[in-house]
Amino acid sequence: MELKNCPLINEIKRQIGSHTHILVGFSGGVDSTVLLHGLVCLRDKYQLPLELTAIYVHHGLNSKADDWLTHCEHFCHNWQVSFISERVQVNGKEGGIEQGAREARYQAYRQYLQPNQVLVTAQHQDDQAETFLLALKRGSGPAGLSSMPAKMPFEQGYLLRPLLNITREQIEAYAHEHGLLWIEDDSNQDDRYDRNFLRLHVMPLLTQRWPHFSQAVTRSAALCGEQEALLDELLDVELQQLIDEHQSLDINLLSRCSEIKRNALLRRWFAKCNKSMPSRSQLSRLWQEVALAKADAEPRLRFFQDEVRRYQQRLYLVPVMEELTDRVIEWSLSQPLILPNQLGILAVSRDSGKTICRAPLADEKVTVRFGLTASSLRIVGRDLARSSKKIWQELNIAPWQRTRIPLIYYNDTLIAAVNTFVTLEGNATTEQSITIEWQAS
């Protein structure tokens, strides 16, 4: 078949559109091999000005993964495609191995995707049907049932799935016609994994009974996606009224909504923060245990690597971090200090900064600590001594932020909470002063 009459090539060309800088997720399996071959054909035979880079993610889950990496690198060399490989650690504790591998893979994609590139992956129509059925098994709503969009925002660009209208049968036929070689992952035959069970046992029966089943499911997924897009459009203005510059939600305004509308807004809040979608039961717990908790409580509810917190009648979605209250970090001041937990960098600045304090004396050792619990404290700008809790409250510092603000000590004397306050002991009067800048991540 001539390339110009090939439905698969034409579909890739249509979906790629005007994008020319492309990062291809390449596992060496038949799907991604066909996708990459199709893009190479568009570059070489259609003369499209495509700049192709393939990335192989080594999950470390299969003893053959090193051989697969070599296979992919060899193919890219022959096809004159730039090649990247990345080894990742898979965390399967929370969502299982499949989800952990996917999260690690897409994190690698984020790491290497350039601002002018789009990410292209090889999911096809049968994958879409399997994703729909898995979402149905979980009891998902329209958002989950919409499955995988052909195009979606990803980092600063887009993620494209140009094979979603192409069947597995078409892909394999193309591979055989063009004499392509690909990797067969033996784990794909392990029906302990839900997706493999569907592909090996359920989909063949459904397709035998209804040959166009995958196509029909893909159409239903698209309709669910359209409904979600319409809801996004209708609720966007109201969501913007609920959210402030810190991406927190106004509980008082949210409480005026019906439960159905409130849940829809909460889901869109999670999506806006690029977090995994909460379940219906999780949304109920969020509202009852966090939003409606007693006024003097400090409620929290964990969602994977984040947690929802409440402060001053607003909901915040914040990352869970390692406890730092026992850490004491020495700092010479002559070099920038990289803070733990990706909290940023401290540096002595000659230009500007919010924290100006006295310079340490020769016999004073400078350390950085976290978590202030002083019973009595006097700070610049306040006449009377106050407890640290009272000071945090007066400065409107949320409880979870209080243990993440770097505290500057000279020996065992608190000098400043960076970007927040300076103590009387650290006040720069007639003495030599320094300016500390915190470049938060």
UniProtKB/Swiss-Prot annotation:
CDD domains: TilS_N (cd01992). It comes from the Bacteria. HAMAP family: tRNA_Ile_lys_synt (MF_01161). It is an enzyme of class 6 (ligase). ATP binds at S27, G28, G29, V30, D31, S32. This is tRNA(Ile)-lysidine synthase. One of its GO terms (molecular function) is ATP binding. Belongs to the tRNA(Ile)-lysidine synthase family. Keywords: ATP-binding, Cytoplasm, Ligase, Nucleotide-binding, tRNA processing. The lineage of its organism: Bacteria, Pseudomonadati, Pseudomonadota, Gammaproteobacteria, Enterobacterales. It catalyses: cytidine(34) in tRNA(Ile2) + L-lysine + ATP = lysidine(34) in tRNA(Ile2) + AMP + diphosphate + H(+). Disulfide bonds: none annotated. It comes from Proteus mirabilis (strain HI4320). Ligates lysine onto the cytidine present at position 34 of the AUA codon-specific tRNA(Ile) that contains the anticodon CAU, in an ATP-dependent manner. Cytidine is converted to lysidine, thus changing the amino acid specificity of the tRNA from methionine to isoleucine. GO terms for biological process: tRNA modification. PANTHER family: TRNA(ILE)-LYSIDINE SYNTHASE-RELATED. GO terms for cellular component: cytoplasm.
